[in-house]
Amino acid sequence: MGVFNYETETTSVIPAARLFKAFILDGDNLFPKVAPQAISSVENIEGNGGPGTIKKISFPEGFPFKYVKDRVDEVDHTNFKYNYSVIEGGPIGDTLEKISNEIKIVATPDGGSILKISNKYHTKGDHEVKAEQVKASKEMGETLLRAVESYLLAHSDAYN
């Protein structure tokens, strides 16, 4: 098994605490509402949202795969940090065991925030991660972030 780590950062004009509430804590409800072209539904299969919770994320028609199942590994409300692993569906299969993801939202001096994202692809055997998998994951994250950001800018009273 190999582990391939990819890190990225992206900025937002939304303050860290507000973005954490919307993007992380209520993303299950918000994503299908603000980005139905990316996520059609999120179903809580097991747990209460904390570590150990299993969620099924379903994608719309025409997507390369129908769903993924995520396991919540950590939710740190104080440091705006969220860790989860993709454990089933989507790219998980013959070549990938799981994908571990860490999202940390850091406040910036101008009142916005930086999302620091780390993706660890745990491969089976000597398989390598394809560049298009990493690109697709980054694009999905960016799509969701910008949709949530637009929603929050249009609804200044939400998630305060």
Swiss-Prot record:
Keywords for the protein's UniProt record, in alphabetical order: Allergen, Cytoplasm, Pathogenesis-related protein, Plant defense
GO molecular function terms attached to this record: abscisic acid binding; protein phosphatase inhibitor activity; signaling receptor activity
One Pfam match: Bet_v_1
Main localization (coarse): cytoplasm
Cytoplasm is among the record's keywords: yes
SMART domains from the UniProt entry: Bet_v_1
Outcome of mutating residue 48 to S: Slightly reduced interaction with BV16
Location of the protein in the cell: Cytoplasm
InterPro entries: Bet_v_I/MLP, Bet_v_I_allergen, Plant_def-hormone_signal, START-like_dom_sf
One GO CC term on file: cytoplasm
Residues engaged in binding brassinolide: 55, 82, 84, 101
GO biological process: abscisic acid-activated signaling pathway; defense response
Consequence of substituting residue 109 to G: Slightly reduced interaction with BV16
Coiled-coil positions: none
Function: May be a general steroid carrier protein.
Family, as annotated: Belongs to the BetVI family.
Name this polypeptide is given: Major pollen allergen Bet v 1-A
Gene name as annotated: BETVIA
